[in-house]
Amino acid sequence: MLGIWIVAFLFFGTSRGKEVCYERLGCFKDGLPWTRTFSTELVGLPWSPEKINTRFLLYTIHNPNAYQEISAVNSSTIQASYFGTDKITRINIAGWKTDGKWQRDMCNVLLQLEDINCINLDWINGSREYIHAVNNLRVVGAEVAYFIDVLMKKFEYSPSKVHLIGHSLGAHLAGEAGSRIPGLGRITGLDPAGPFFHNTPKEVRLDPSDANFVDVIHTNAARILFELGVGTIDACGHLDFYPNGGKHMPGCEDLITPLLKFNFNAYKKEMASFFDCNHARSYQFYAESILNPDAFIAYPCRSYTSFKAGNCFFCSKEGCPTMGHFADRFHFKNMKTNGSHYFLNTGSLSPFARWRHKLSVKLSGSEVTQGTVFLRVGGAVRKTGEFAIVSGKLEPGMTYTKLIDADVNVGNITSVQFIWKKHLFEDSQNKLGAEMVINTSGKYGYKSTFCSQDIMGPNILQNLKPC
């Protein structure tokens, strides 16, 4: 896989100044703005619609397992299908060289939640090679726009009810379609492709003007390929989400180990796995969010470094957005500001969602001791595991704070448990307790306080009560 990307950067030789026109779709040039930067030096003319053979495959609650192929060229196929003109339409758009499995999985999950028109776009004939796919996505984007235009004119269907979900090159393809349809409802970019799109004009790539609301999930972002990323680091939506920093996802292969062992065959295999894993996380996160409306809360921050340092655990009274399907519920979703970068952490395996808590504990006791303090928070049904809050010198009267990412959503906090464990060579008989614990969590930053007057020996559980 890496070789394809490198060839894409190094290959030159396409002539300039040509134009091709296709009935229904209009004309396409190979000049500006597609030749404005080095990263688009390979631009050429897109293939004909007949050669690409874009297909629209409809799934609904009436046919969740077997698609109906519908066509704007023959609108009677739409009329004869289960397409509902009173329903929202979500179109899943794959990127380069994709077999369509994630699209089918996406429709399957969406239809568990909603009675919608779920359409998978098949343009595999035009996307088997990356360089051709970059050029062909303009024609395919025009095909999507033509499809929506037919819905508008023949079925009085509002473009505001259309949501395009595009992965990799499919994100920019969605942007091309949106730029042709004023009032398009929403575009979700899933790790938009970087090569040939980094630092390009907005006419070339996905940007906030392409729909009423554009949200983006970055999972393998880089400024250049050799940063080991095939997505773009650039913000290109109203809300841009950078889970785990947006570059390398936990659970994806480590490239360093085989390289240090000089096992280059293993390294080549790991490289392909690395790109595929990180790039795919974007649609995996989105799919998981569909049935978890309270998951993937994200926080505004200048950088992931600052987020990890605990400097960005703040939501305004309007709350923080959630990454994924329910991002459009965010109050400020249409405001493109400098604060549109949002960060969060995920797990390394599915279920990926994590719920962030800020835990502050004030210790009580008589003497300083050496050990580790653990807290566990619980709701009406579930509890988190134990989280280490502080380790080392434990001083009564001091307050210690830690941000933790829980793998369960406990909802409203109803209980807090405290336990401390002394260090191996600590032989004192000291007792410690949690005088007060403050938990801050949720998209609105809810605070809850728990208290106790007890002090306990090591390894003895202390239960705190609301106060």
UniProtKB/Swiss-Prot annotation:
Q: Which InterPro entries match?
A: AB_hydrolase_fold, Lipase, Lipase_LIPH, Lipase_N, Lipase_panc, PLAT/LH2_dom, PLAT/LH2_dom_sf, TAG_lipase
Protein name per Swiss-Prot or TrEMBL? Pancreatic lipase-related protein 3
State the coiled-coil residue ranges.
none
Q: Where is the signal peptide?
A: 1-17
The entry's keywords: Disulfide bond, Glycoprotein, Hydrolase, Lipid degradation, Lipid metabolism, Secreted, Signal
Which residues does the record list as glycosylated?
A: N74, N125
Q: Which family does it belong to?
A: Belongs to the AB hydrolase superfamily. Lipase family.
Name the reaction it catalyses: a triacylglycerol + H2O = a diacylglycerol + a fatty acid + H(+)
Organism annotation: Homo sapiens (Human)
Let me know which tissues express this protein, per UniProt.
Overexpressed in hepatocellular carcinoma.
Its Gene Ontology cellular component terms are:
extracellular region
The residues annotated as the active site are S168 (nucleophile), D191 (charge relay system), H279 (charge relay system)
Q: Which GO terms describe its molecular function?
A: lipoprotein lipase activity; phospholipase A1 activity
* E.C. designation(s): 3.1.1.3
> Can you list the disulfide-bonded cysteine pairs?
C21-C27, C107-C118, C252-C277, C301-C312, C315-C320, C451-C467
Q: Where in the cell is it found?
A: Secreted
